[in-house]
Amino acid sequence: MMSEFSWFDMAQRRPCTFFDDRPENEEISLLVIHNISLPAGEYGTPYVDDLFTGVINCHAHPSFADLEGLRVSAHCFIRREGSVLQYVPFNKRAWHAGTSEFAGRNRCNDFSIGIELEGTDDTPYTHAQYIALSELTRKLLCEFPAITHDRIVGHCDIAPGRKTDPGAAFEWPRLFDLIK
């Protein structure tokens, strides 16, 4: 049975149109951790929010040229200071995983929730981010029992060779200690 839980009460809701319905009767059974910063390695900018809300100015920085026309989203984005922005209700399919496979199944967006951390693969994440991520993860584990600890993965795990996030700087044991 699909949980009615759609919005995290500690998150600021943000407008986003880059999502659609999950396949009928699809059970949410995977949590995917990502990282993002725009420009890469710069924090506290409005550009990630602009990307997910579809208003990014692709001329604002030379590295944004590849973002022209890109339609991507995540369910949530956790900033460095720990604030959580939510773009897509959990019962809807966000467009975060791209070409992906987990446990023999393709199209991970169909059955996953995507959480973006503001960061890079090699920059340590903040204490506030781990706290916010653990609070959100605990809530998701309660609401979606098919998400088990072994089904909390990085983007690198579902798209190896294509993606590397959340990277070597992400402390998996720290997250799992916090969600016990």
Segments predicted by a language model, with ranges:
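N-terminal catalytic cores of peptidoglycan-degrading enzymes
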Residues: 1-106
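Basic/polar, cationic surfaces and motifs that engage anionic cell-wall
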Residues: 2-9, 24-25, 106, 111, ...
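Conserved, mostly hydrophobic/aromatic
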Residues: 33, 115, 133
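Residues immediately flanking
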Residues: 35-36, 117, 156
